[in-house]
Every structure is written in C-alpha cells, then in structure tokens.
Amino acid sequence: MDVRQSIHSAHAKTLDTQQLRNEFLVEKVFVADEYTMVYSHIDRIIVGGIMPVAKTVSVGGEVGKQLGVSYFLERRELGVINIGGPGTITVDGQCFEIGHRDALYVGKGAQEVVFASVESSKPAKFYYNCAPAHMTYPTKKVTPADVSPVTLGDNLTSNRRTINKYFVPDVLETCQLSMGLTELDPGNLWNTMPCHTHERRMEVYFYFNMDEDACVFHMMGQPQETRHLVMHNEQAVISPSWSIHSGVGTKAYTFIWGMVGENQVFDDMDHVAVKDLR
C-alpha cells in the first residue's frame, strides 16, 4: 500500500515537477495478477487497479491489518469499473459478470471479493475507488445502459464530451462514493474547462483510452496558482478540494472520475472563469 499524506495548498505551490508527481500522480495502476493500492489521507480514499491474467486476484487480510480492521471492506464501500476485457467479480460467493465498461458497487461488509478475467489474452482491467462507509448498501451491477449520458461542450471550444454517471444517487445509493466515466468526442482535447473546485469533495481522475505517443496535460492547483502534470495512458491523479482539475490532451481520451466527501450533489462546485486563471 502506497500512502499519500495530505498537503497544504501553500506547500504544493512550492514543489517542482518531480515533487508534484510524487504527491499527486499514480503512475502505475495495473500490474498483471496483482492489485495496486494508493491510500490518500485526503478523505481517506483508496485508488487502484486489478488485472487478473493467469490467476484470480483478491485483496487479502494484510490490507485489513494496514487499515486496522479484520478485512478490506469491513468499514468501506467499493466502486469498480472495468476498462478491459470481460471479467467476473465474486462477492461472498455471488458471481457478477462484468464486461467492458460495466461497473460494480460493493457495499460495506463484504468479506470476500475475487476478481477474474474470462480470457487471459484479453484480461479485465478493474479500476477501483474505495471510501469509508457508515452503513451497508446493496451490492449492485451497473452497465452503460443503466446510466443517462449527458453531452456537454462544443467542437468549437474543443471540449465536446459525454458524461456517464455510474455511481450517483439517481442510479444507486452509496454512503459517499460517486464515480463516472467521461469520454471526449474525436478531435476534442479539453475536459472540465471552464474549470471548478469543490470545497466539500475531493476527486481522483484516471486517464485511459490513450495512444502510447499521446499525453494529457492535467491542470491542478489553486485557480491563481496553477500547475500541470504530464500524464500518460492508464494513470491517475489525486485532486484535493482546493485544486482545480482539468486537462488538455494531444489526442482525445477518456477518464474516470471518482469523488468522496461531504455530499453527492454533482453540481455543487465553485466555478472559475477562464479569465481568472493564473
């Protein structure tokens, strides 16, 4: 488990490129037949990936010890979105078939969660966010057909994109975790511009569906103290509440967003005009 401490905005603006990457970038999300796990002190979110290839993968008791509990989800809820080939997730003996871009919410208290791929030549890639939970909501599969896509932006401003809200109150109940997937139209490069912050929630972006020679310049920092991180395919970035989170790519891309914090009101955000950015 890679533990990331909270960081004050006044400290963050003094960091150089490598220091910013050390604090906020999750460089390697998927490793064959293993789980990766980054624990952030910011709202206690856990972020990572699971890619079963030659065997099944489960999160063992060693993580429970690190979290001070008996097992991983004793006091947590889990959200998973599969960006790879078809797979399965077995939760306490109940098997869910999770295809490409299908998702699974796993409620607090699930003791055994086992991840598998249907074909080792086309492994599933389970990206997950995990957050503290105060009560148990039912485990539920969510498919792209279950969400209501919302298209925003314009080709003229190179930010036409479709937002798919997987784990939001209109789709299913969670304690605090919200997740979704945003896909840019071909030829569009910007996400979340004009940008915003949200004082009451933190957020993690996971960029994927990118060519090897492509990158995203992810914008972060306070609106008047912006910085950037250069990100490549299948990398994630932690965004504190005080930070903007926007990006521009060399080509179109897709990203998964996950939020935890005070509320789940999607539009509860503090907008920042482009003219006010520095």
From Swiss-Prot:
Catalytically driven reaction(s): 5-dehydro-4-deoxy-D-glucuronate = 3-deoxy-D-glycero-2,5-hexodiulosonate
GO biological process, one term: D-glucuronate catabolic process
Cofactor: Zn(2+)
Cofactor, how bound (note): Binds 1 zinc ion per subunit.
Entries under Gene3D superfamilies matching the protein: Jelly Rolls (2.60.120.10), pectin degrading enzyme 5-keto 4- deoxyuronate isomerase, domain 1 (2.60.120.520)
Enzyme Commission number(s) of this protein: 5.3.1.17
Pathway assigned in UniProt: Glycan metabolism; pectin degradation; 2-dehydro-3-deoxy-D-gluconate from pectin: step 4/5
GO MF annotation list: 4-deoxy-L-threo-5-hexosulose-uronate ketol-isomerase activity; zinc ion binding
Source domain of life: Bacteria
Residues involved in Zn(2+) binding: 196, 198, 203, 245
Record keywords, A-Z: Isomerase, Metal-binding, Zinc
InterPro entries in UniProt: KduI, KduI/IolB_isomerase, KduI_N, RmlC-like_jellyroll, RmlC_Cupin_sf
Free-text function comment from the UniProt entry: Catalyzes the isomerization of 5-dehydro-4-deoxy-D-glucuronate to 3-deoxy-D-glycero-2,5-hexodiulosonate.
Similarity comment text for this entry: Belongs to the KduI family.
HAMAP family hit by this protein: KduI
NCBIfam families referenced in this protein's UniProt entry, alphabetically: PRK00924.1
PANTHER family: 4-DEOXY-L-THREO-5-HEXOSULOSE-URONATE KETOL-ISOMERASE
Protein name stated in the entry: 4-deoxy-L-threo-5-hexosulose-uronate ketol-isomerase
Annotated gene: kduI
